[in-house]
Amino acid sequence: MVEFDPGPPPNVAAHLDRVPSYVAHQDLFWYDWGPIFYRGRLDRSARLLCIASDPGPTERIACRTLVGDAGQRVQGFLSKLGLTHSYVCVNAYAYAFLPSRSMSAIPILSEPEQQSWRNELLSMIVGPELQGIVTFGLQARIAVEQWNDAPPVMIKKVPHPSSRDATKLITDWRAAVTDLRTVITPDASGNNSGPNYGDKFTESDYAPIPRGDLPFGMPSWLGDDSRGRQSRPKRRNTVERDAADLLHTLIWRAPTG
């Protein structure tokens, strides 16, 4: 059977379409590329809710979040919990922020309209099956702290997968996996008894994005940058921003061979 993500249920799609305007803050974001909302299950069946900060270039191509190098690290994290399907990933912001302006964008999270829309989304996509929440990075942590109706489940607050503090990243992720394994029920096709993280990230700690998380018609290699990570020079993503036109041009390279 061909696996692909058919898109959000009608009620969730209607809510996503009502995302509050970012136009007043467009100088803080890659605004003209538009919003990107989710990856995974939106039918309230998720056992784990993952919240990151914002989407990146690869996510724009995929129209799904956490698909590039950072997303493949998160997928490896999910794999260590034995989750192959029962998860949902969203972001604190619907738009990608400019890295140099990330702290300036923090107050937007607390704007009443943004906070209300985000909290309603989170409450719409989780249900009684939820067993845990993971926040990846500062913005995600703030988003959960502002979620007044957050379910009473285990919440692990860890660094973003792109954190430059490699030691804290691997240490905190290792501890989170240990704790979450005590409460997250693995999927039937998953295994939570494999190795945890070691002293540093290795290729075995990554996992490709499942085809069932992506729209129909995506290339087979989108969401799996293992060849690029092992190439010289190393390419962690097939999609990157063009240095000559950072705001409006993406470069998408198909792997060779």
Regions found by a protein language model. Name each.
Residues 1-180, 186-257:
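A polyanion-binding, active-site-adjacent surface
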